[in-house]
Amino acid sequence: MTQPIVRSIPLHVVSNDHPSSSPLQPGVKQSGEDKIGRSPVQFADVPVLRKPSWIRVRIPSGNAVQSLKAKLRENRLVTVCEEAACPNIHECFSHGTATFMILGEVCTRRCSFCDVAHGRPKPPDPEEPISLARTVAEMGLKYVVVTSVDRDDLRDGGAQHFVDCIAAIRQSAPQTRIEILTPDFRGKGRMDRALDILAACPPDVFNHNVETVPALYPNVRPGADYQWSLTLLKRFKAQHPQVPTKSGIMLGLGETLDQVQATLRDLRAHDVDMVTIGQYLQPTSHHHPVLRYWTPDEYKALEEYGMALGFSHVASGPMVRSSYHADHQAKEAGLGFNATVSLGSPAVSSTEHRERHTIASKSASKTESIRHR
């Protein structure tokens, strides 16, 4: 078995002496140092670990990436692939696919792992659901993933906008299966309101990422609550037992194997059907450092452990991300649909399509690694 690359690095909680700035204007982005520098948790003087060979990503040739970006901009859509600096962007874009974000490009949270900008979001764009649905229909997509930034400024956390997008896609592309990757809808009464709204038009797959083990939440997901996320997943499943539920975690933030296994058990105990496990990669030097690169053998062992717990599907590997090959995760988990996708070229079989990805809508949310709230 390949030996893991491990480094124990102390993280420092420091006083926030970052100079105060004027009130944020709607839509103005804080990223990198501007975003993380205002967090009470700082990562000072942390050396960068050398990436192992299994983390390398091949950059494909051709102009497919630029072509898809142009199409997205034409429809005023933004992908999480771009906003969260996903390492799989070239593979996915070169095959004409992406994961769309809705509800803007500015997040109300300051998660230390995520490269999505922080700030004061603009009001939801009422035209976005139609733009998204039109793009999905034009591209002939059979499976889409819709995610968002956290919208703590909205009474329903953005749930109604998710439903509007689901309804618009089903109107324009009725054969398309829809997975939503939601924030946690945390706040007084917000989860209740969000679940009531989603009940009117539930997705085909409901995804919410716990992101990491509970002990690391103060450093990794300030503003979030581990048990709250588990409760959201369980309550949605109880409300919609026929809809597969899904969650994801990142590795390399300082967690132990026992903690990861305990988190997998927690997810299964809260009726989660599918899980993704992938390596965290540091977006910038200001973000949470990578404290360990887990090996391919360890990811394989976690996949086997998860399947033994009763998950219908476990996607575990260094480059696995929450929406990466989401269509095949859903299909292998028993969600029946034709995974063939037409993107203006000859149809691709499900087997050939395994090297492709998925799609969803505007704005920002998830993370450089797995994203997900």
Swiss-Prot record:
Span of domain Radical SAM core: 93-312
Q: Which GO terms describe its cellular component?
A: cytoplasm
Q: Which PROSITE patterns match?
A: RADICAL_SAM
Q: Is Cytoplasm given among the entry's keywords? A: yes
Name the residues that bind [4Fe-4S] cluster 2: 107, 111, 114
Q: Which SMART domains match?
A: Elp3
Q: Where is this region: Disordered?
A: 12-36, 346-373
- In its keyword annotation, does this UniProt entry include Metal-binding? yes
Its pathway is:
Protein modification; protein lipoylation via endogenous pathway; protein N(6)-(lipoyl)lysine from octanoyl-[acyl-carrier-protein]: step 2/2
Q: Where in the cell is it found?
A: Cytoplasm
Q: Where does [4Fe-4S] cluster 1 bind?
A: 81, 86, 92, 323
What's the chief localization of this chain?
A: cytoplasm
Keywords in alphabetical order = 4Fe-4S, Cytoplasm, Iron, Iron-sulfur, Metal-binding, S-adenosyl-L-methionine, Transferase
Similarity annotation: Belongs to the radical SAM superfamily. Lipoyl synthase family.
Name of the protein in its database record: Lipoyl synthase
